């Protein structure tokens, strides 16, 4: 990680993963616990020339590192095609820390952030 304000994800320590994942966040009703599920389609960490073992997903930013060891490969026709990682938190403080990382990661990757309330989107068309 070259820049202190940059947030990155690594599967191999010291090697930033350039593929931007799809991320879904879920929380318990009381807000204390939850998960973020990351899906990386065709990540460079799965490239045939990479010989290192993936031992976890490492999320690094100016505050330090968040780690999950829950990383699974998805295979299509016997070939690795995606990585799915699940980061779990067990307190409001852990959730807030994760969200600070997520905002920095979105900013570093040029992404937007949207919050789905679970409600159906409003329609622009009239019923008539």
Swiss-Prot record:
Q: Name one GO cellular component term.
A: plasma membrane-derived thylakoid membrane
Entry superkingdom: Bacteria
Annotated Pfam families: Psb28
- What Gene3D superfamilies has UniProt attached to this entry? Photosystem II Psb28
Q: Tell me the GO BP annotations in alphabetical order.
A: photosynthesis
Compositional bias annotation for Polar residues: 111-128
The yes or no answer to whether the keyword Zinc is present is: no
Keywords, ordered alphabetically: Membrane, Photosynthesis, Photosystem II, Thylakoid
**Which compartment or compartments is the protein found in?**
Cellular thylakoid membrane
Q: What is its main location?
A: membrane
| Residue segments, region Disordered | 109-128
The protein's topology relative to the membrane is: Peripheral membrane protein
Record-stated family:
Belongs to the Psb28 family.
Q: Cite the record's note on assembly.
A: Part of the photosystem II complex.
Name the UniProt record assigns to this protein: Photosystem II reaction center Psb28 protein
Which gene specifies this protein's sequence?
Answer: psb28
């Amino acid at each position: 990680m070259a820049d202190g304000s940059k947030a990155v994800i690594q599967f191999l320590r010291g090697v930033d993963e350039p593929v931007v994942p799809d991320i879904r966040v879920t929380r318990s009703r009381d807000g204390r616990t939850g998960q973020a599920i990351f899906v990386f389609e065709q990540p460079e960490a799965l490239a045939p020339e990479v010989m290192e073992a993936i031992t976890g997903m490492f999320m690094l930013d100016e505050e330090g590192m968040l780690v999950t060891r829950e990383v699974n490969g998805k295979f299509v026709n016997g070939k690795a095609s995606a990585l799915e990682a699940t980061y779990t938190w067990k307190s409001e403080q852990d959730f807030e820390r994760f969200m600070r990382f997520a905002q920095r990661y979105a900013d570093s990757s040029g992404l937007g952030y949207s919050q789905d309330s679970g409600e159906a989107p409003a329609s622009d068309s009239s019923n008539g």
